[in-house]
Design a protein with these regions (language model features):
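Switch- and interface-adjacent substructures of P-loop NTPase systems
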Residues: 1-102, 117, 135-136, 152-156, ...
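Short glycine-/polar-rich loops that comprise or flank the Walker A/P-loop
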Residues: 54, 102-105, 143-146
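Short conserved micro-motifs at the rims of enzyme active sites and ligand-binding pockets
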Residues: 69, 119-121, 159-163
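Acidic, Ser/Thr-rich peripheral helices and adjacent loops at domain boundaries
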Residues: 78-81, 126-133, 160-190
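Short, conserved secondary-structure transition motifs
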Residues: 104, 109-116, 148-160
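GTPase G-domain guanine-specificity segment
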Residues: 115-140
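Conserved P-loop NTPase catalytic core
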Residues: 134-136, 144-147, 154, 174-175
Length: 238
């Protein structure tokens, strides 16, 4: 599809474009092509593949938006809420399963759990809860089994203990993506709830990206908490 996102626009600039763009403008063309993509490509994909699903995992990278702004986090939140509208949630009886499939187990997962130390995982999961529940969205999932967790499907770092000035603290060791160097660093604290918008005017988060480590032949792929995800989704079916 021949369209592309308009990045780095503020909310006011976006609204101005929607109000003032002429029918033959680039903005109007992009909007038309995007709507065609939604109605004819995405909708058809959902109808053909997702209508029979009864278990769902929703993944979200809560760390990367923190490196940018509250608006970046809000954009991801809005995208998720739009996604929810395409699925049916609720308890299922036998007839429902046959004629009207619904999601009856739903897990919300914060990714990149290996990019922070283990003591920060509760805060990362808390951000995931805020992402989903803010604005009362949790009401839609009141009748189904839900859970929140944080994982790394491929673990890229190792947690180590560093002694400095007579004090010990947890740190991460891994290959940093930006320079491909092996580093040992403290990644920083994850807020339990999203700071207000003016927080980013004075300071910012800097969560580094890490490369998956090279595996020896026959070595298992390291992960964080993938076993818990499989147990939640499939445990009652085994």
């Amino acid at each position: 599809m021949q369209f592309f996102p308009l990045l780095h626009l503020s909310a006011s600039q976006w609204q101005q474009l929607k109000r003032e763009a002429k029918s033959e403008s680039y903005f109007a063309v992009l909007t038309k092509r995007y709507e065609y993509y939604r109605q004819h490509i995405v909708k058809g994909f959902y109808e053909n593949y997702f209508e029979t699903f009864d278990r769902q995992v929703i993944l979200a990278d809560c760390l990367t938006p923190l490196n940018h702004s509250r608006q970046a986090f809000s954009d991801m939140q809005q995208a998720l809420h739009q996604l929810f509208r395409n699925f049916h949630y609720g308890k299922r009886h036998l007839l429902n399963r046959l004629f009207s499939p619904k999601i009856d187990k739903l897990m919300f997962i914060a990714t990149k759990a290996d990019h922070i130390t283990t003591d920060q995982l509760p805060n990362l999961i808390g951000l995931m809860r805020q992402l989903v529940q803010e604005g009362g969205r949790y009401v839609e999932f009141a009748d189904i089994v839900t859970d929140y967790t944080a994982i790394a499907s491929i673990r890229a770092t190792q947690q180590v203990v560093v002694n400095q000035n007579g004090q010990s603290f947890k740190a991460l060791q891994g290959i940093r993506s930006s320079d491909k160097q092996k580093v040992t660093l403290y990644p920083g604290s994850v807020p339990g709830r999203l700071p207000s918008a003016d927080f980013w005017q004075n300071q910012k988060f800097e969560f580094d990206q890490f490369e998956p480590r090279r595996l020896e032949q026959g070595e298992n792929i390291p992960h964080l908490r993938m076993d818990a995800v499989l147990q939640f989704l499939l445990g009652d079916k085994l």
